[in-house]
Amino acid sequence: MTRIAINGFGRIGRNVLRALLERDSDLEVVAVNDLTEPAALARLLAFDSTAGRLGRPVTVDGDTLVVDGRRITVLAERTPGQLPWKELGVDIVLEATGRFTSAEAARAHLDAGAKRVLVSAPADGADVTLAYGVNTDAYVPAEHTIVSNASCTTNALAPLAAVLDELAGIEHGFMTTVHAYTQEQNLQDGPHRDPRRARAAGVNIVPTTTGAAKAIGLVLPNLDGKLSGDSIRVPVPVGSIVELNTTVARDVTREEVLEAYRTAAQGPLAGVLEYSEDPLVSSDITGNPASSIFDSALTRVDGRHIKVVAWYDNEWGFSHRVIDTLELLAAN
């Protein structure tokens, strides 16, 4: 078993643990570090407003979470370099606080005794950025100890872009994600560094920024600098959709585009890219573990101009890619 510690037991940290409980994996979560009381963490794991009840017993024994019989040490340390990873025999740290998102900051986990760090966000200076299934081969175990999993949106965009680029060569493009609100927004109007995100998340459509278009160049170097984009946050708790508008190098037909995505979803990107002909809405894809759920009916083609669209569960799908990447690191 590979011993995993989760630093930050928020939306992604808890969803990763939930997903691990459903998978046959050699990963063992032995510790979580969060500044919240263990009893509160136990409740948040057991009862979830979007994922539902866990359906497995969760109790607290002092500073230990007991989840379906598995004992997980709970820590409350603000400084990653002070965490007892060496004493706990931790192999890999999942850095999921959203705070320590640079290689320099994440390196503190290595100093504390971990062998590798996976950052569940874009990370400046990371040894490699992976969108599992799309650029998995970029991982070089001997060289990469601090790995970024990019973001949920990058993981949804990457299969879309990769298939289209291979089919016809993307020259340039724009992406827009219509994204569920997140904890980083305000519940009610209040101060925020982004004046739009300052407004109440549950009652507004909120235009804002996304780093996904920039990050795609780290995953697919051939597309570096070719895409730009924006995000629109909307009043749903989970379930997002990304639209990619591109100009490609040659004329293509709509059927060529659809066939390329069908083939990829059944072959090299199986489990990461899903092909759908159903008239989906956001609630239909919650709980779907794919990174990217291609909505074939929304495909538009006009010669060299192409629009493709994919849904994604921005929590559950991304959490499964985190686990896939942890398993990749553990095996190498």
Locations of regions flagged by a protein language model:
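N-terminal Rossmann-like NAD(P) cofactor-binding subdomain of oxidoreductases
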Residues: 1-198, 322-328, 332
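C-terminal active-site/capping subdomain that shapes the small-molecule cofactor and substrate pocket
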Residues: 229, 241, 245-332
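Acidic, glycine-rich segments within the central catalytic cores of soluble metabolic enzymes
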Residues: 166, 170-237
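Short, flexible turn/loop "capping" segments at secondary-structure junctions
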Residues: 139-141, 197, 234-240, 300-303
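Generic secondary-structure signature for well-ordered alpha-helical cores
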Residues: 21-25, 162-170, 180-183, 210, ...
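Generic structural signal for residues in well-ordered beta-strands
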Residues: 72-74, 227, 308
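Generic structural signal for well-ordered, non-membrane alpha-helical segments
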Residues: 9, 13, 102, 150-153, ...
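Short, solvent-exposed beta-strand edge segments and adjacent coil->beta transition regions
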Residues: 1, 143-144, 200-202, 239-243, ...
